[in-house]
Structure formats: C-alpha cells, structure tokens
Amino acid sequence: MLVWLGEFLQQYYSGFNVISYITVRAILALLTALLVSLWIGPKVIRRLQLLKFGQEVRHDGPESHFSKRGTPTMGGVMILFAITVSTLLWANLANPYVWFSLFVLLGYGAIGFVDDYRKITRKNTDGLIARWKYFWLSVIALVAAFGMYAIGKDTDATRLVVPFFKEIMPQLGLFYIILTYFVIVGTSNAVNLTDGLDGLAIMPTVLVAGAFALIAWATGNVNFAEYLHIPYIKFSAELVVFCTAIVGAGLGFLWFNTYPAQVFMGDVGSLALGGALGVVAVLVRQEFLLVIMGGVFVVETLSVILQVGSYKLRKQRIFRMAPIHHHFELKGWPEPRVIVRFWIISLMLVLVGLVTLKLR
C-alpha cells in the first residue's frame, strides 16, 4: 500500500524512492510486524484470560503439561493480525502472489479459530470433526492451487525444481495442482503437530520463513536466479515482504510464548503459519527445500505416522509418545532442553537447505 504512496510522493521529493526498494520494505515489514505483535500481545492475552479461553491438555500426556491447563490459547490471532497489517502496508498489493499467500494464511487461520473455539467451549481436545477440518483445508488449498496454476501455466512458475540437478526442471502441468495441494495441507498439519511445547513451533517457522525471504529475493532477481540456476519468477520478489512479516510477527509472539509460556498460538496460529510456509514454498518453486529446511516438522509428522501405523499393524508403539517431542519429555528431558535442541536442529537444516541452492 505504501509503495503506491511512495511513488506518488516521489514527484515532490526523490527521497521517497527508497520505499520502492524491496530490501527496505522487507526490513520495515519485519519491524512493523514485530512491534505490532509486541504492542497487542498483552492486550490479547488479557482478553483471552477474561474470556476464559484456556488451553485443554491431553489426559494421557506428560504430567509436566498438566500445569499448562488454563493457559490462554488462540494467541495466533495476534500473529495473523501483525502479518496481515505489515504485509498490507509494505507489500505491492498489485502482486497476485501476495494475495495468494494472505488467502491461505487467513483462510487456514479461520479454520484454526473454529477448531480452537470448539475445543474451548467443549472443554476437550477434540475440536472440529476431522473430516470437516480436512474438507475446508482442502477447499482453500485447491482454490489457491487452481489460481496459482492459472497465472503461471506453462511457464517457469510451474516447473519442478530438483535439488542438486540444475538441468532437471520438468514442466508439471496439471500435476502442479496436486503437488500444491499436498504441500499446503501437509505443511499446515506438520506445523500443527509440532506446536506442542512452549516456543517449539514458532522458532523453526521463523527460521524457515527467513530463509524463504532470501530465496524469494533471489528467485525474483533475474541475475541471481541465473547465477543459482533456479527459475526466475517475476512475482516472487514481493514474497520477501510477506516472509519477513512472518519473521517479525513470530519473534513478537515468541516474546510471550517462550518457556514458561504466557500464551499458546493454538490451531489458529499453527495451521495458518504452516499453510503460509507451504504456499510460499510452492510459489518460489522450492518444495524440496521446504522438506529439508522444515525437517523438524517432517520428523514430528513421521513420528505420528509411524506410531499409529506400528500400533495398528503390530499392537506395539515405537515411541513412548508421539509426536516425538513428547517421547523425549517422557525420557526425562526437561522441556526447555527439548525446545532448544529442536531449534538448533532447525537452524542447521535451514543452513543445509540454503547451501543446496548452490550445489547444482
């Protein structure tokens, strides 16, 4: 929005041209989202406490979690508000990729909001009926997928980028829609499963979003895209602003979510952030990098799949409890140790992912 204001004011003072620089707007988007999140955080927490929107805890979970019962949840609303405000202020709103990203973010946030609200009002951890939850997640993902395909059909925006192989970039055709669906829905649920400890999900989300900001910038720059042997996608540069807004809002939320947490993001936050990472990965054509950089999310999801599959087939559990962060808790690891070690692993995986951009 302010891009247009800057363009208008340039005729009166050339210094306003600085607003046109993507790097400047990215930094300002990060700071705006951070400050908005820090500003509204205490207000949101107080409001959630007054409404008695407290977290419900699994009865079969670690005993250390019983003390978390009643901690305000649905704090993800402040993350979404900060990201949306910052993106609308600093992104070029004529860019369709910005709107696809906001559509998935807010659409998944709405589903998460309903899910959280049902858990709170029913005083259990069930929430939305699974089939309806996945139905609406699928509807939003498919609407976004068809729209993205319509814009990028038969261009580099619908090619598959394979790590380590610069010559292998097949045109996906309609398979692009299927891949987009699974990436968005899968990432959303993976982040949701990871959000089980104080700050566990938000820091990997911040790290991956920060990495995607760099990738989006390179993908939207014809010279860097050619240098890295990745597709040049003209609309992708504006995603830098969206990604840095996620970083800022995430860090602001972590201020209140760090152990011991004053507020939890709830499904309204985790589903939305996961969906946002998924749609960005698709738009910059780096789905494989998302698997690498978001390795913590992948492992958490696989631990649940393996646990359920093993129990159904062999009536035996692989882990003491799934997702895997609970397994380490039941082994005696203090919660902060689990959290920080997962953060370190996430940072390492993000760096590995960024390195693979050049290893082609």
Swiss-Prot record:
Primary location group: membrane
Pathway(s) per entry: Cell wall biogenesis; peptidoglycan biosynthesis
CDD domains linked to this entry: GT_MraY (cd06852)
Domain of life the protein comes from: Bacteria
Assigned EC number: 2.7.8.13
Membrane-protein topology: Multi-pass membrane protein
Keywords, sorted A to Z: Cell cycle, Cell division, Cell inner membrane, Cell membrane, Cell shape, Cell wall biogenesis/degradation, Magnesium, Membrane, Metal-binding, Peptidoglycan synthesis, Transferase, Transmembrane, Transmembrane helix
Cellular component terms (Gene Ontology): plasma membrane
Cofactor: Mg(2+)
Catalytic activity: UDP-N-acetyl-alpha-D-muramoyl-L-alanyl-gamma-D-glutamyl-meso-2,6-diaminopimeloyl-D-alanyl-D-alanine + di-trans,octa-cis-undecaprenyl phosphate = di-trans,octa-cis-undecaprenyl diphospho-N-acetyl-alpha-D-muramoyl-L-alanyl-D-glutamyl-meso-2,6-diaminopimeloyl-D-alanyl-D-alanine + UMP
Membrane-traversing stretches: 21-41, 73-93, 94-114, 132-152, 168-188, 199-219, 235-255, 263-283, 288-308, 338-358
GO biological process, one term: cell division
An example molecular function term from Gene Ontology annotations: metal ion binding
Subcellular location: Cell inner membrane
Function: Catalyzes the initial step of the lipid cycle reactions in the biosynthesis of the cell wall peptidoglycan: transfers peptidoglycan precursor phospho-MurNAc-pentapeptide from UDP-MurNAc-pentapeptide onto the lipid carrier undecaprenyl phosphate, yielding undecaprenyl-pyrophosphoryl-MurNAc-pentapeptide, known as lipid I.
Family membership noted in the UniProt record: Belongs to the glycosyltransferase 4 family. MraY subfamily.
HAMAP family found in the cross-reference section: MraY
Protein name according to UniProt: Phospho-N-acetylmuramoyl-pentapeptide-transferase
